[in-house]
């Protein structure tokens, strides 16, 4: 059983560094493509300010020259979802569950265990980077599929641009989750609520060592309860009263 979570744009490097691992072949190819861009080209590529582009250029060059500082991925990323995941003061069994089941999907590193070393970088599957003539999605498809080959239960907390990297065969196994708010009888989906809920849901999975869809259906967390009337076999819907 594996749980997939995406990367985030926000990062926090206020953590102790850890030792880097050698880059996979696929990751090196992506890095080589990124390293061709000048700082001013990155400004256009990332659609960011000149100052931000300079920062990203420095990150890419540091990775290329093996100077980059690395951090556990789950602690490096600091978006809204990540800030709602229990990342510190885990019990031994919670830590073991996290290490065994939670995977981060990255457009640079591939699919890796949540505490794998990562260096600060900015890349997602909506970016139009060509790697040896292929799109990022095409470049990663077989490695992404291979990482989940043989897994029967796959919980996806990914957005659609990450899910579509996988083949149909893998996607058909994925259990997805929807988090909604009930405002006076009106069900609403809100990006902020969804991101916070994904983090709180993952925390509940970790704390209760969930292994099956049946166990996931029984969860109540952060005001959310499972709604069987809105759910299907492969999409579980949780609703919170506003």
Predicted regions and their residues:
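Active-site helix-to-loop segments that bind/position phosphate- or nucleotide-bearing substrates
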Residues: 2-89
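Internal, well-folded beta-alpha domain core
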Residues: 86-242
